Amino acid sequence: MFGFHKPKMYRSIEGCCICRAKSSSSRFTDSKRYEKDFQSCFGLHETRSGDICNACVLLVKRWKKLPAGSKKNWNHVVDARAGPSLKTTLKPKKVKTLSGNRMKSNQISKLQKEFKRHNSDAHSTTSSASPAQSPCYSNQSDEGSDTEMASSSNRTPVFSFLDLTYWKRQKICCGIIYKGRFGEVLIDTHLFKPCCSSKKAAAEKPEEQGPAPLPISTQEW
């Protein structure tokens, strides 16, 4: 394979008399042939002479092709490259990659710690939200279970695989459920606990009774 070919650069001690560039990829030429057009082409009020770069020569040739009566000029090019060379001004600053890698590793470690802390919190809330409790004996125990379920549901993070634009989170008497658009229900066993009211309603449901028996007459004939 061919190696990288570095383009040849031409330099001028005085620099271009128009843009003041001291280096160019093309040769510098004498400005005597173009000095008569400097005033109209570049909007100069003084005479300039010396070397001229190829870019400024092309601007003069372009100005000559303008239609008659055109007032366009390239005054913004005058002394545009005066001062430090183009190579030094466009040289990018070296970034310390070591410090950047350290910052990335610190951020990753912080994210890992936070993720572990969230997992531990979720585990503690799920373990406290589903204890083996006896049936409700008083209103006070009902209120305690409701507050416990509410606190655990608030602290438990939402599962990442749920599309919250489709599943809507709803709080009912038995805990937290996720309901879809067409009536389907998604239940998380850690956040759902049948309450006493539903159990009592199921137990107190009257059984279906058969037809009433006919009265038996005891009168003798």
Curated annotation (Swiss-Prot):
The lineage of its organism: Eukaryota, Metazoa, Chordata, Craniata, Vertebrata. Belongs to the SINHCAF family. This is SIN3-HDAC complex-associated factor. Residues 124-135 have a biased composition (Low complexity). One of its GO terms (biological process) is negative regulation of transcription by RNA polymerase II. The gene is Sinhcaf. Coiled coil: none annotated. Residues 111-121 have a biased composition (Basic and acidic residues). It comes from the Eukaryota. Residues 110-153, 201-221 are annotated as: Disordered. Embryonic stem cells (at protein level). It is found in: Nucleus. Keywords: Nucleus. Its main location: nucleus. Residues 136-153 have a biased composition (Polar residues). GO terms for cellular component: nucleus; Sin3-type complex. InterPro entries: FAM60A. Component of the Sin3/HDAC corepressor complex at least composed of BRMS1, BRMS1L, ING2, SAP30, SAP30L, HDAC1. Found in a complex composed of at least SINHCAF, SIN3A, HDAC1, SAP30, RBBP4, OGT and TET1. Interacts with SIN3A and OGT. Subunit of the Sin3 deacetylase complex (Sin3/HDAC), this subunit is important for the repression of genes encoding components of the TGF-beta signaling pathway. Core component of a SIN3A complex (composed of at least SINHCAF, SIN3A, HDAC1, SAP30, RBBP4, OGT and TET1) present in embryonic stem (ES) cells. Promotes the stability of SIN3A and its presence on chromatin and is essential for maintaining the potential of ES cells to proliferate rapidly, while ensuring a short G1-phase of the cell cycle, thereby preventing premature lineage priming.
